[in-house]
């Protein structure tokens, strides 16, 4: 018998979601890569696997695999999908869940309008926690590229590593070419997600994100959180920021640098299917 899956998305950042509570699922890197192919597989940005947890206080394990098969520690858009998936398929009757990823714990709250708020934890700036190879923590870092040019960027971890660049216009930003160079830069030993941020006003930014292992996606929840945190810390934006991505808007709330940062946005079901091989 094949493995049942559900296709979901958060603002167009698309996933297959697998129930590992009621099914035994062991996918290899090669299998995930084949399934992610949009011509010969299903096609998705990430594969999400929800599993039972044996740890007190944790409702589920939440595993995230990029399209290249790499398991990563954070996906905010996926977390919203996981919350609605768990309730819809009867894995829980709760509206507030705690899930454990490879790197962090996340609190998920299903709101009355079926949007989901995700506690993304306290952002981390220390180079060793990102990780980034740097002698000391700095508001901004300079990276030398293969072509001899240098680029200035901010670096932060929100459960996964992010670089954030301030640009004048995201429509003309070299997201794919420069994003790829930065993502694979040796100063980021685990690769890095790269956000191109345009500040619109005190409460709004526009953003495009090159995701490690995926390329540019039309929405990235953790990227929105990372960019909003950088905007608040270094550009004096509000404690409530609307992040406009190609796929739609996310709301980020961060009352102070020592508090957890909260991501709120939608999630949607698309279809169900069965993996035959």
Curated annotation (Swiss-Prot):
Substrate binds at residues 13, 46, 66, 76-77, 160, 193, 211-212, 221-222. One of its GO terms (cellular component) is cytosol. It is found in: Cytoplasm. GO terms for molecular function: diaminopimelate epimerase activity. The record marks 162, 211 as: Could be important to modulate the pK values of the two catalytic cysteine residues. It catalyses: (2S,6S)-2,6-diaminopimelate = meso-2,6-diaminopimelate. The record marks 271 as: Important for dimerization. Pfam families: DAP_epimerase. Pathway: Amino-acid biosynthesis; L-lysine biosynthesis via DAP pathway; DL-2,6-diaminopimelate from LL-2,6-diaminopimelate: step 1/1. InterPro entries: DAP_epimerase_DapF (IPR001653). One of its GO terms (biological process) is lysine biosynthetic process via diaminopimelate. Its EC number is 5.1.1.7. The active site is at 75 (proton donor), 220 (proton acceptor). Keywords: Amino-acid biosynthesis, Cytoplasm, Isomerase, Lysine biosynthesis. Transmembrane segments: none annotated. It comes from the Bacteria. PANTHER family: DIAMINOPIMELATE EPIMERASE, DIAMINOPIMELATE EPIMERASE, CHLOROPLASTIC. Homodimer. Catalyzes the stereoinversion of LL-2,6-diaminopimelate (L,L-DAP) to meso-diaminopimelate (meso-DAP), a precursor of L-lysine and an essential component of the bacterial peptidoglycan. Belongs to the diaminopimelate epimerase family. This is Diaminopimelate epimerase. The lineage of its organism: Bacteria, Pseudomonadati, Pseudomonadota, Gammaproteobacteria, Legionellales. The gene is dapF.
